[in-house]
Amino acid sequence: MIDETLLEGEEKMQKAVEVAKDELATVRTGRANPAMFSGIVVDYYGSPTPLNQLASISVPEARLVVIKPYDASQLGAMEKAIRDSDLGVNPSNDGQLIRVSIPQMTEERRKEMVKLAKHKGEEGRITVRGIRRKVKEEIDRIVKDGEAGEDEGTRGEKELENLTHRYVAQIDELVKHKEAELLEV
């Protein structure tokens, strides 16, 4: 019973790390990256649609992103959505595709992005700790109801702590990697 609870908790922690990884991918570095456009939503015939579902996004050069829409009539809406996003980039539209050149980031902007990356990492850590709390409550309930012994409960809690430390360390590693990427000039 406790092992099943731990397994469920571990799966949720893995998902939390994946979410943190995806969130960190959206933090802009000085390099072009298709993932930075994943949070952009375009008004497509009245319904909000993610940009990556409306166009192919490629990176032909380190500081250039090319967005080729599947429906050329949506170029203007896509360009507006990119311009209005918090990426701080200026797209250019040539009638067929959108080119976005990624400007060199200022030192101040880099520090802002590092702060944002740390914040997203902290959100991931909070999620993992919340999962730990729920799993611990479930283990305590199992022991209290007599479905497992005290020793099993203690072993389960130790295992839970190890899982928590492992997944928090993974998130810390992702943040550290992102920070190094941001501060690299």
Curated annotation (Swiss-Prot):
UniProt xrefs under PANTHER family: MITOCHONDRIAL RIBOSOME RECYCLING FACTOR PSEUDO 1 (PTHR20982:SF3), RIBOSOME RECYCLING FACTOR (PTHR20982)
Q: In which organism is this protein found?
A: Saccharopolyspora erythraea (strain ATCC 11635 / DSM 40517 / JCM 4748 / NBRC 13426 / NCIMB 8594 / NRRL 2338)
User: Which GO BP terms sit in this record?
Assistant: translational termination
Q: State what protein this is by name.
A: Ribosome-recycling factor
- Read off the CDD domains from this record: RRF
Q: Please name the HAMAP family in this protein's record.
A: RRF
Keyword Thylakoid recorded: no
> Chief location of this protein?
cytoplasm
Entry-linked Gene3D superfamilies: 3.30.1360.40, Ribosome-recycling factor
Q: Would the keyword Nucleotide-binding be found if you checked this record's keyword annotation?
A: no
Q: Name one GO molecular function term.
A: ribosomal large subunit binding
